């Protein structure tokens, strides 16, 4: 944990695993990888890669028999743990960094909120939406996946980066639609609760394009998140082109209901 890298991470965490804008901050995946598959998993990916694979295609081949659904299951597990830094190596330090994830959504009517362009999960990236659960014992989130290329919410400025870093001076692009992708869209989503004693509680994961999921909120929940992973039906290789508008996005909208 360092202040500089972490602040950048919280601003850019929704991006694809190999996105150029998080090339120095996207290290939490490797904590999840080595914790689940052993310390040598990291070195095996580099030593046993085969052209034209990227690192995650090599991971799928070595550990998941090239099963894309298993890959997304592994990525959702990683994302849901990353939201509270639930990794053994991070345990001594993670308490000070709780409650920092955020995502922007815009109202689109009838209680629905649409994910902002600037928070939309890219292919194999995730969004962590904090939920204000005070006084409630059950939450239901209705989910609707949107087609890539769909219109942004009316209030969404639709600004994007053009340049080699995600810095304010490079926030010069403008769009009124989400980025398109040459693949059918897909998602994984569910809940994560962080309790006051540091315990984490995870819901089951859902993969429906449209549906409603509920979660009984544990007592002593301090932070509650709805986590959405971008999981298109075919693997998307991420190209370093310094143009955010070319990055595959998996947009969605949600409606949140509480029971007290």
Which residues are covered by each model-predicted region?
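Acidic/His/Gly-enriched intrinsically disordered linker/tail segments
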Residues: 1-36, 40, 46-83
